[in-house]
From Swiss-Prot:
Organism encoding this protein: Bacillus subtilis (strain 168)
Cysteine pairs bridged by disulfides in the record: none
Phenotype for residue 56 to Q: No effect on zinc binding. Strongly reduces Vmax. Reduces activity 500-fold
Residues reported in the UniProt entry to bind Zn(2+): 53, 86, 89
Protein name, per record: Cytidine deaminase
Family: Belongs to the cytidine and deoxycytidylate deaminase family.
An MF annotation (GO) of this entry: zinc ion binding
Enzyme kind, highest EC tier: hydrolase
Length: 136
């Protein structure tokens, strides 16, 4: 699957978004190394802190099905420029994807920004930070 096909899947996922409060629909499509695609959309809740973003929905679906090796993630929304993942999504992406996974950000006008996970969140907090030997 190429980049444009994955973007099309992200746009399809966006159509499934449950965003009755913000009306801000986001879709994501995650391509595994073996060619499977997991789509995710944002799902809102009246208690905003309970909302889940499209990127995390796609990643959690994949991991819950046993897929943990990814090659590309596409995210699409109706924004002036390519959509920018929130900080929580950036952290989850950096935790569940290797640094070289390609992240494709786009909008409904077809503007595209492509980067690696490492470029998306440089200096990410990781499991290595939790296991660092510290003197108290």
């Amino acid at each position: 699957m190429n980049r444009q096909e994955l973007i099309t899947e992200a746009l399809k996922a966006r159509d499934m978004a449950y965003a009755p409060y913000s009306k801000f629909q986001v879709g994501a499509a995650l391509l595994t190394k073996d060619g499977k695609v997991y789509r995710g959309c944002n799902i809102e809740n009246a208690a905003y802190s309970m909302c889940n973003c499209a990127e995390r929905t796609a990643l959690f679906k994949a991991v819950s099905e046993g897929d943990t090796e990814f090659q590309m993630l596409a995210v699409a929304a109706d924004t002036p420029g390519p959509v920018s993942p929130c900080g929580a999504c950036r952290q989850v992406i950096s935790e569940l994807c290797t640094k070289d996974v390609i992240v494709v950000l786009t909008n409904l006008q077809g503007q595209i920004k492509e980067m690696t996970v490492e470029e998306l969140l440089p200096g990410a907090f990781s499991s290595e930070d939790l296991h660092d030997e510290r003197k108290l």
